[in-house]
């Protein structure tokens, strides 16, 4: 009886099978597009900001840092500080490069997804810097590599006179985000 009913209503059954197929295909497409959108938005944010993070807080107090560290909703806290700004080298005096310090969490976890290439190591000594080719070019130092030294006149916002120091390149990185920076030790 079911067999006879099935063959008698071929048109209806074909429409029903097509409707089920299209519904499954539509659900699959929606979920695929949705998941891809979320992944691509995260990738875009990493490439635009140069970090895998959700928030930035400037000028945090010690109490705010402790509150974030004790919060179960905060997964990681990376600290970054502006150590100064480049004023001149022997080759160029129109620089746009900053001197930045970052802690281990920021460099190893938050900044890592935005880095495409890293040679050498993060600065440990006071006179070491981790550079990008873009920052070296901005300072007129495009031919330098790991182990090379250069003299830089730099300033900070502490109201002191500009200082001159010889830095040694301990690493070179490339990736996304701001590239006109020299990472320095604490």
Walk through the language-model features, giving the residues of each.
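N-terminal Sec/SRP start-transfer signal
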Residues: 1-25
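Charged, alpha-helix-enriched surfaces in structured cytosolic catalytic cores
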Residues: 1, 32, 164
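Alpha-helical transmembrane segments
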Residues: 23-34
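Basic-flanked hydrophobic alpha-helices used for secretion and membrane insertion
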Residues: 35-186
């Amino acid at each position: 009886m079911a067999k006879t009913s099935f063959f008698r209503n071929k048109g209806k059954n074909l429409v029903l099978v097509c409707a089920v197929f299209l519904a499954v295909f539509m659900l699959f497409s929606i979920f695929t597009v949705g998941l891809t959108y979320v992944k691509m938005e995260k990738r875009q944010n990493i490439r635009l900001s140069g970090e895998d993070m959700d928030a930035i807080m400037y000028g945090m107090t010690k109490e705010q840092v402790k509150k974030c560290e004790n919060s179960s909703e905060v997964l990681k806290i990376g600290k970054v500080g502006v150590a100064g700004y480049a004023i001149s080298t022997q080759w160029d005096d129109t620089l746009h490069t900053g001197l930045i310090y970052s802690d281990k969490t920021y460099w190893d976890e938050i900044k890592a997804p935005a880095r495409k290439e890293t040679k050498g190591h993060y600065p440990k000594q006071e006179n070491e810097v981790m550079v990008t080719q873009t920052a070296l070019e901005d300072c007129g130092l495009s031919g330098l590599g790991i182990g090379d030294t250069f003299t830089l006149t730099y300033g900070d916002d502490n109201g002191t006179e500009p200082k001159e120091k010889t830095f040694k390149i301990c690493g070179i990185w490339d990736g996304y985000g701001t590239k006109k920076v020299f990472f320095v030790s604490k």
